[in-house]
Curated annotation (Swiss-Prot):
Domain of life: Bacteria
NCBIfam families per UniProt: 3a0107s01c2
GO molecular function term, any single one: ATPase-coupled phosphate ion transmembrane transporter activity
Name the record gives this protein: Phosphate import ATP-binding protein PstB
Binding-site residues, ATP: 38-45
CDD domains per record: ABC_PstB_phosphate_transporter
Keywords associated with the record: ATP-binding, Cell inner membrane, Cell membrane, Membrane, Nucleotide-binding, Phosphate transport, Translocase, Transport
Biological process, per Gene Ontology: phosphate ion transmembrane transport
EC number: 7.3.2.1
UniProt lineage: Bacteria, Pseudomonadati, Pseudomonadota, Gammaproteobacteria, Moraxellales
Length: 252
C-alpha cells in the first residue's frame, strides 16, 4: 500500500449512547481512491463524516481515538475545524448548490479562507470548474444561478466548490445516487482524474461503482471494519467470508 494520507487508529463513534463505529483501524492511502461499501446503517457515512469532523455541528455526537492527517490527530482539541474542512472537502449524496451564481458557488469557500484579488479569484474559479470538468459548459453563464443547472452539472459544481479551496482530501458520500446513468458516468470519470491530485474516500451502495473507480475497498458491517484491501482482491478473493457473502449477494 502507498504511504497513508490518513491513519485511523482505535476510532469509536457515538450518537448519544449508541456506538456507531467500533474500534476502526485503517489507513487511507495518498492519492488513491478508497471506497467504503456495506449495507445501510453499517457506519460508512458516519466514518466519512469523522474525517472532517462534520459531526461537530450536531450535539450529542462524539468520537474517540485518533485520525491522523499527515501525522497530526485531527480529533485533538487544538484543531481549527474550519481550516480542517478546507483541507478535507466533502460532496454529499444530493447536489447541494447554494442559491447564488455559479461563480459565487465556487468562490464561496475560498472567500472564507483566503483573501484573493478579483483576477486571482477569477483564475481560481476557472481552475476549479476545469478540475470538475464543468468549465466548457458554464464559462459563458457564470452569473447564472447554480440552481439552473441540471442534476449532473449541479453535482460537478459541488465538486468544483469542494476543490476550489485546494484541499488535500476529498470525501464523496454517495455522490451519484441521485443522478442518471450518463451523469454518473461523467462523475466516475472525474473521480479517476481527480485522484492524480487528491486523496479520495467515497461511500457507495453501488458495488459495481466501487469496483470501477476505487483502488482500495473497505467492507463495513454494523459499525465494524470487516476487511480492507486492494479492490481487485476484495472483489475476487476476499479474506473474510462475510465480505464474500456481501459481494456475491448472499448477505441477508
Amino acid at each position: 500500500m502507498p504511504p497513508a494520507k490518513m491513519s485511523i487508529r482505535d476510532l469509536n463513534f457515538y450518537y448519544g449512547d449508541f456506538q456507531a463505529l467500533k474500534n476502526i483501524n485503517i489507513d487511507i492511502p495518498d492519492k488513491k481512491v478508497t471506497a467504503f461499501i456495506g449495507p445501510s446503517g453499517c457506519g460508512k457515512s458516519t466514518l466519512l463524516r469523522t474525517f472532517n469532523r462534520m459531526y461537530d455541528l450536531y450535539p450529542g455526537m462524539r468520537a474517540e481515538g485518533n485520525i491522523n492527517l499527515d501525522g497530526k490527530n485531527i480529533l485533538g482539541k487544538d484543531i481549527d475545524v474550519n481550516l480542517l474542512r478546507a483541507q478535507v472537502g466533502m460532496v454529499f449524496q444530493k447536489p447541494t448548490p447554494f442559491p447564488m451564481s455559479i461563480y459565487d458557488n465556487v468562490a464561496f469557500g475560498v472567500r472564507l479562507y483566503e483573501k484573493l484579488s478579483k483576477a486571482e479569484m477569477d483564475n481560481r474559479v476557472e481552475w476549479a470548474l476545469k478540475k470538475a470538468a464543468l468549465w466548457l459548459e458554464v464559462k459563458d453563464k457564470l452569473r447564472a444561478s447554480g440552481l439552473s443547472l441540471s442534476g449532473g452539472q449541479q453535482q460537478r459544481l459541488c465538486i468544483a466548490r469542494g476543490v476550489a479551496t485546494k484541499p488535500e482530501v476529498l470525501l464523496l458520500d454517495e455522490p451519484t445516487s441521485a443522478l442518471d446513468p450518463i451523469s454518473t458516468g461523467a462523475i466516475e470519470e472525474l473521480i479517476t482524474d481527480l485522484k492524480n491530485d487528491y486523496t479520495i474516500a467515497i461511500v457507495t451502495h453501488n458495488m459495481q461503482q466501487a469496483a470501477r473507480v476505487s483502488d482500495y475497498t473497505a467492507y463495513m458491517y454494523l459499525g465494524d471494519m470487516v476487511e480492507m484491501g486492494e479492490t481487485d482482491q476484495i472483489f475476487t478473493n476476499p479474506a473474510q467470508k462475510a465480505t464474500e457473502d456481501y459481494i456475491t449477494g448472499r448477505y441477508g
